[in-house]
Amino acid sequence: MSGRRVLALYAALLFGFAGVLCRLFYLASRTDYAARAAAQSTVTLELPARRGGFYDCMGLPLTGLEKRWLALCFPGQENYTRLYACTDTAGQELLYRSRSRAAPFLVEVDRDMTALGIPCYGASRRYAAAPLCPQLLGYLDGEGHGAAGLEKALDALLTGSGARDTLLCPVTAQGTLRTGEQVQHLQADSGAVGVRLTLSRSVQRAAEAVAAQTMTTGCILVLDVRTAALRACVSVPGFDPADPAASLEAPDSPFLNRALQAYAVGSVFKPVLAAAALEAGLAPEYDCNGAVVVDGQIFRCAGGVPHGEVDLSAALAKSCNGYFIRLGQQLGAQALLQQAQALGFGRSIGLAEGLIAQSGALPGAEELAQSGQLANFSFGQGSLLATPLQVAAMMNTIANGGVYRAPCLLDCALDETSGEELSAFARPQAERVLTEQTAAALHTMLEQTVVEGTAQDASGLPGGAAGKTAMLFGVPAS
């Protein structure tokens, strides 16, 4: 090769290297390219969306009771063994699958491992292993939105904008954390707030324990006498809100809130007739021989057992059907219907949007014009239907001196960080429907029902008790 050609080749190589160097200098001096390169080596992880929680009347949490953490794992770390011992089966499977993963990931653990060099971020399981009032609170769908109960009714409030915190992880090509750099935690304010309910966590837990020991299906309600605020609402059987699909085929309809469903009423309706009689100044005596005949139809007392000479108090305590049939005839259908409506029968009770106690059914005046139907109505039978919540509200009215309040469940929205009340939910208005004298007389009669009547199983309770029992299709209810 001639000297001229060699010189030309060297010149071409020199120009080529010079071009490459100029291009490298250009790229290095461009901040947007540098940022783009950094972004390509930064992994972004989203933390679960923060959802407002439910709290009881004392501010104690009803959801999020089981604290958990999300541990940030980088490939190649030698702490997989420690993480494996601190997570559940799903977390262990995730760790196993991610052994050769070239990117960081999050796994749920049961303790904060930050002090051990593993970054952890606070989280919680929405529902405890022994969940509280699942039919009231409801559950979430696969996207984390309310699908039933209060979770659905208050979803917008609890969710806010849905904005999530993010983690920016500067990584190497192998997915490990770059030397000398740290993970950035970018916090987002979703505006989600908590909701304080009227429930009492301790009373709810106690009621659920009683239900678990004494019933396979049924419900328990506890109301605050003065305000009619729900302190406990138990419906059995229940379900796991963390895994509602597991109960879809379960017997006895566990998703059903029995406290809000309408059923035949039975003898717990008799205080309504007693109230109407006292308001009308009636307290007749009656000689019960165990049965009464109305238009050729025989209505018997329980077991056909005669109660003998009874007044209003004794008839209520012994649950004498014959007495109340005769009393209903004296009072008439209109007076009975008016009294029942005043005490909340025949009207629904709204606890939240979509969470409504059924209105039940009151027979019409035309139906009660038939003497047999009036007789049935007089001791809680026939077409009469009511929810346990309606019956509880009626009894609460007597305990509250004759003042009716519709039961309520929602108290206020609150800031979960400060505990500050943000806005209060509306409460139903109070309405006097019985005189104080009538309420006091009924209260005494219902105490006697416990002391010497059909409700003696409740006698001896600390502080005393008053109440009424019923028998529905052979199944006792109270």
Feature names for model-found ranges:
Residues P61-T63, D224-S267, A275-S478:
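Beta-lactam-recognizing serine transpeptidase/beta-lactamase-like catalytic domain environment
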Residues M1-A245, L337-A342:
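Periplasmic/cell-envelope proteins involved in peptidoglycan metabolism and beta-lactam response
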